[in-house]
Amino acid sequence: VGILSIKTPATTAPVTLSEAKAQLREVGTAEDTLITALITAATQEAEQIMQRAVMPQQWRWVMDAFDTDGDNRISIPTPARAVASVSYVRETDGTTVALTVTTDYLADVRSEFYALVFPAYGTSWPVPRAQPGAVEIVLDVGWADAASVPQIVKNWILMRVAALFENRAAWTSGEAIFRNQFVDRLLDRWTVATV
């Protein structure tokens, strides 16, 4: 079992300010700062719902040991474009050691829903120091660029931006703003199932 966290956040958005303004039928520039913030909020909400990154970024998977459930594979519950690094704290001297891809470990990132990391043929995982967070795997996650993000995910983000723009408060006249279930179901195809 590990802890997944953002190491390096995304620096670009999946939809442009122009695309969002077209969705809103907004032509002026007075609301540009707000709309840009809403794009960020909607993107982060999509990531939370789908349990996956939208734009390129790095996530860190931290474990106390090479937790493999007995089959030597480490299954990380998020899709990845690549495994950027695997490192551990050496048991004997407490030094952080970076493992080498193909020599020490291999990665399988073909799945849309998880990444696998396992020792290279003929090797086994080293024994890390018995301390919290002794093993760290850094993943390159998210679609490669905005053009690679599925259009349905972009459509959800644009619709969410429009809903947030129109309803700038969580409550109106004492009544909650209801979410459109159909719109939220658009993300189902890309949602990582959690157990």
Across the structure, where does each feature detected by a protein language model lie?
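Divalent metal-cofactor coordination and adjacent catalytic microenvironments
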Residues: V1-V195
